[in-house]
Design a protein with these regions (language model features):
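Fe-S-dependent hydro-lyases/dehydratases of central metabolism
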Residues: 1-469
Length: 469
């Protein structure tokens, strides 16, 4: 009997036809997708030009998230002309082609990846493609998911299938003792640093080990969300009872007898004991501390007690040049301590760290404290439902009492394309996924960290150790 990895099992179950003799090129069935107002317009134009319909409208969800304002007093449509056009076009596409669209004002609106999970649209064993690289996040629930381009969105809409190039298998086993205040964000930043920005190119990464099993589902979502930052096309974690409990009762999760049958099948979704991986890595997180990025790529990070590395110590000329460029852009020096670096802004949000657990941990840090003078901070819940739940728990009051702005759901400051934008020279500690040059505004400097670390920096006025009250 042939042994298989979890990734291979799911892809094989969705394979309609092998298109190459080696089985790498395939035609696969895609279970579901989500579209936003920014990456989907051309796909719908192609459908119209070719007189085609969306093959399975119920498998498609549209949500407004990239270009909408997060302002507390936002209106149904953005005030910026191009953004307004994009939103109206998505709504029209939903109406014309028969799929649900969540716009501002809808109680279910939110960031696409947050909404897909909270509504139970993502289930173990599914194969999902969507027009955003962080689609890989769904692997936290035991699904294979990956980002696709506009032409693939069009092909999926018309056929519910895609031409797919099978990935190699990589297993990352995470072991060791998890220290106090070490979050999933710290763990994934450490993994990305260890593996490098291109360390998982061409692979689906399966995360496993005692540390992974110990993570909550929402922590696993953070982990899988950022696997793409070391170039993994997809990432996955075998579903367990935590996942089943998390999904039960959600809007699109199976009900009644179908739920029992689904769980029975989901329990089979794991790599066989003798399954062969193309690449295996073990990472020990014993001694890991809360971490922060210092450069302009997520792999350029260090623990809070470390100093910024010296490019001269790097043997690879390309990496050395990348470090030098990053230090110049960030206005930092080799050997400088990351701890104590002054900030101007703090942000919590994005598909990486905007769920209810993220807001709770940040609120615990902020309780009874005030923003440091000169620091501006705002929090953007990942969905309108997350926002409502947080308000029911009184979390919004803690943020507001501390001086933070409590805003509406959207991608917001994860990327500077929606009115939430910082200025040249601003330095922001951010619970997002990317710290590229200009990501939050022209010449803005971004430091990635966990929500708890962001909260602590906001009241100190500088990057600080959350373990030190």
């Amino acid at each position: 009997m042939t042994t298989k990895t979890l990734y291979d099992k799911i892809v094989d179950l969705h394979t309609i036809e092998k298109l190459s003799s080696d089985g790498i090129e395939r035609l696969v069935y895609i279970d579901r997708t989500v579209v936003n107002e920014y990456t989907s317009p051309q796909a719908f134009s192609l459908l119209r030009e070719n007189g085609l319909k969306v093959w399975r409208p119920s498998a498609t969800l549209g949500t407004v998230d990239h270009v909408n304002s997060s302002s507390p007093d936002r209106t149904e449509f953005p005030t910026e002309e191009n953004a307004c056009t994009q939103v109206k076009y998505l709504i029209k596409n939903g109406s014309d082609f028969g799929f649900e669209v969540l716009n501002n004002g809808n109680p279910k609106q939110g960031i696409e990846h947050v909404v897909m999970v909270e509504r139970g649209k993502v289930l173990p064993g599914m194969l999902i493609g969507a027009g955003d690289s962080h689609t890989a996040m769904y692997g936290a629930l035991g699904a294979v998911a990956y980002g696709i381009g506009t032409s693939d969105i069009y092909h999926y809409m018309a056929t519910s299938t895609l031409r797919y190039k099978k990935l190699k298998n990589m297993r990352v086993r995470v072991a060791g003792v998890r220290g106090a205040s070490v979050t999933a964000k710290d763990i994934v930043l450490f993994i990305v640093k260890k593996l490098g920005a291109g360390g998982c190119t061409g692979h689906c990464v399966e995360f496993c080990g005692p540390v992974i099993s110990d993570l909550s589902v929402e922590e696993r979502l953070t982990l899988c969300n950022m696997a793409v930052e070391c170039a993994a096309r997809s990432s996955i974690i075998a579903p367990d009872q935590k996942v089943f409990d998390y999904l039960e009762g959600r809007e699109f999760a199976p009900k009644g007898e179908m739920w029992s049958k689904a769980v029975e099948f989901w329990k089979t979704l794991k790599s066989d004991d003798e399954a062969k991986f193309d690449k295996e890595v073990e990472i020990d997180i014993t001694g890991l501390e809360p971490s922060v990025t210092w450069g302009t790529s997520p792999d350029q990070n260090c623990s809070i007690s470390e100093s910024i590395p010296d490019p001269a110590s790097i043997s690879d000329p390309k990496i050395r040049a990348d470090y030098e460029r990053a230090l110049n852009y960030m206005g930092l020096k080799a050997g400088q301590k990351i701890k104590g670096l002054p900030i101007t802004h703090a942000f919590i949000g994005s598909c990486t760290n905007s769920r209810i657990e993220d807001l709770r941990t940040a609120a615990e840090v902020l309780k009874g404290k005030k923003l440091a003078p000169g620091v501006k901070a705002f929090v953007v819940p990942g969905s309108t439902q997350v926002r409502a739940k947080a308000e029911k728990e009184g979390i919004d009051k803690i943020f507001k009492d501390a001086g933070w702005e409590w805003r509406n759901s959207g991608c917001s400051l994860c990327l500077a394309m929606n009115g939430d934008i910082l200025g040249a020279g601003d330095r922001c500690i951010s619970a997002t996924n990317r710290n590229f040059e200009g990501r939050q505004g022209v010449q803005t400097r971004t430091h990635l960290a966990s929500p708890a670390m962001v909260a602590m920096a906001s009241v100190k006025g500088f990057i600080a150790d959350v373990r030190e009250e």
